[in-house]
């Protein structure tokens, strides 16, 4: 059985088993605390019956006007808990918060262009590639900016793909 609850400060000292994955971006403690203070409803922790962390979601709300949206900063599931639908459940919670609490037009995320497993998973969740961001990750790896329109974007304008790649300095990141 899995419990998904709001992420709390103490979770920062419990989720190393999840962050050991080389594809998981990790951040400094103040970064996580900033998210907890500004967007607490967009951070979730999944744990098993014994309280062991299984996965987490960290997100935020950002942008202006029709670019107001929810952003997936990190979603990660421990290797032993993958392929049971946990990432889908965590993503759904963030999407729901982005829609109902923050009234966003879409949800976006960045994923390494080489991470085909994640790209396929996000596509299955209804996300599509909006643009390529050249050299976004360390080692000059490109990112795909993937988006999913929320009900507020009735005409789905937020997910019309750009025809050309952008650089991090050119993009509203």
Curated annotation (Swiss-Prot):
Keywords from UniProt, A to Z, are: Acyltransferase, Transferase
Top class in the EC scheme? transferase
Name the family the entry cites: Belongs to the acetyltransferase family. ARD1 subfamily.
Which Pfam families does the entry link to?
Acetyltransf_1 (PF00583)
Source species, domain of life? Eukaryota
Q: Which SUPFAM superfamilies match?
A: Acyl-CoA N-acyltransferases (Nat) (SSF55729)
Keyword Cell membrane listed? The answer is no
* Classification of source organism: Eukaryota, Amoebozoa, Evosea, Eumycetozoa, Dictyostelia
Q: Which Gene Ontology biological process is one annotated for this entry?
A: N-terminal peptidyl-methionine acetylation
- Which chain positions lie within coiled-coil regions? none
Q: This protein is called what?
A: N-alpha-acetyltransferase 20
Query: What is the name of the gene encoding this protein?
Result: nat5
What the protein does? Answer: Seems to be involved in N-acetylation.
Q: What CDD domains does the entry give?
A: NAT_SF (cd04301)
User: What GO cellular component term, any one, is given?
Assistant: cytoplasm
